[in-house]
């Protein structure tokens, strides 16, 4: 969890610098989304609450919220990825007595970043999508995969909360980008078919 909070601090700091707006103003609205994510362990199930929290911020453009939050809920799984990288190293040390080599870890991290984009926003989605990587790249046996699933499930709620809360920072960056490039706000009306 400490890693999650450090990552969120870096992410919101970078978003504040890039956009020229306060990331703390965005972050202060994310309490309900964070708690919902902890309870559901699902970015998809937390989406409605996250949208509501993001719309409360004065620093986020409404059109960027409507575009960014649903997109990032599906492709931005930083908390899950951070946790999984830490856990593969821990499980490797515990079961096999050594950490994975630098080469396999670099390859694993690169591929995990790609796999995480396609992982479903459901409980355990990231680790389930990456089991092939864990066994194929890091050469974990069945006992290593089983331990990864068990340990990951115990903390998945906090990874999901980091994912959802980080979406606010990315949307702040998106707002900053739109303003720097003079992209005007679009008001989309409901269309009846």
What are the residue ranges of the model-derived segments?
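Loop-to-transmembrane-helix entry motif
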Residues: 1, 34, 71-79, 154, ...
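Helix-loop junctions at the membrane interface of multi-pass solute transporters
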Residues: 16-17, 50-60, 171-177
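Helix-loop-helix junctions within the multi-pass membrane cores of secondary transporters/permeases
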Residues: 36-116, 184-191
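Transmembrane alpha-helical segments and their short flanking loops
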Residues: 85-193
């Amino acid at each position: 969890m400490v890693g999650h909070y450090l990552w969120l601090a870096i992410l919101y700091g970078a978003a504040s610098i890039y956009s020229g707006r306060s990331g703390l103003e965005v972050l202060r609205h994310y309490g309900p989304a964070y708690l919902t994510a902890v309870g559901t362990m699902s970015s998809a199930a937390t989406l409605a609450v996250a949208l509501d929290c993001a719309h409360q911020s004065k620093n986020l453009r409404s059109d960027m919220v409507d575009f960014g939050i649903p997109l990032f809920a599906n492709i931005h799984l930083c908390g899950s990825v951070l946790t999984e990288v830490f856990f593969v190293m821990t499980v490797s040390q515990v079961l096999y007595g050594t950490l994975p080599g630098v080469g396999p870890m670099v390859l694993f991290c690169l591929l995990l970043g790609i796999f995480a984009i396609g992982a479903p926003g459901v409980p355990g989605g990231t680790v389930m999508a990456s089991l092939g990587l864990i066994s194929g790249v890091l050469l974990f046996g069945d006992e290593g995969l089983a331990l990864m699933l068990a340990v990951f499930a115990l903390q998945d709620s906090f990874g999901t909360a980091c994912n959802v809360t980080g979406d606010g920072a990315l949307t702040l960056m998106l707002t900053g980008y739109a303003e720097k490039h003079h992209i005007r706000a679009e008001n989309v009306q409901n269309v009846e078919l």
